[in-house]
Amino acid sequence: MPQLRWLGHAAVELLINKKRVLIDPMIKDNPLSPVKLDSFNNNVDLIVVTHDHYDHLGDAVELLKMNPKASLFATFDLEVYLSNEYKIDMSRFIPANVGGFIDFDGLKLALTKAVHSSEHSDPSGAIISGENITVYHAGDTGLFEDMKLIGEVFKPDYALLPIGGRFTMDPYQASLAVDMIKPKKYAIPIHFNTWDLIKVNPDDFVKEVSKRGYRALVLKPGQSVEL
């Protein structure tokens, strides 16, 4: 059965279709991380990066070196930058942009729109689908109306949404996102309480989501849930 583990901030580990997937893997500089980077030595299959702010690109480059069989999934512009900057062969990347599903070794992957900023490419969200489960990781984003289309097109079971405010949606705005995305199982808050600037009460998110007829699940750093 697929499992999801929140690693603090926006970092998520997904075990799905016999693959270990790391999304926005900031581990070393993550004050909430329950794990050390060396726990992901030679056991990661896919690294997903929504954009290249340091708290999302994180340790992706080092993880590629630690996992010679792993691939990295991001926008093509970001992949080209990483290839040139860190001398990584382009064969390690899965070329993509916002659009439809891409098949990757039994998984289906897609990138979605996100409303944010980024260093070397447009920001994105990510869709990972396998074993009849679809997970939407919104990356960093503000609220935008096309979230309705993300729900309609990809029909996620789980929506991982930033709620820390200031740089992304706050709990109330994220609850409006849930109402548009309509996750079939749970909305899971991310990107909050890592630092004082994004300190919020996740229970506010849970209450607002419940008012709209959906369920939210707050994980502690290191906590896993079966999907």
UniProtKB/Swiss-Prot annotation:
Naturally occurring in which organism (per UniProt): Sulfolobus acidocaldarius (strain ATCC 33909 / DSM 639 / JCM 8929 / NBRC 15157 / NCIMB 11770)
Disulphide bridges, residue numbers: none
Molecular function in Gene Ontology: hydrolase activity
Alphabetical UniProt keywords: Hydrolase
Organism superkingdom: Archaea
Name this polypeptide is given: UPF0173 metal-dependent hydrolase Saci_1512
UniProt xrefs under InterPro entries: Metallo-B-lactamas, RibonucZ/Hydroxyglut_hydro, UPF0173, UPF0173_UPF0282_UlaG_hydrolase
Family classification: Belongs to the UPF0173 family.
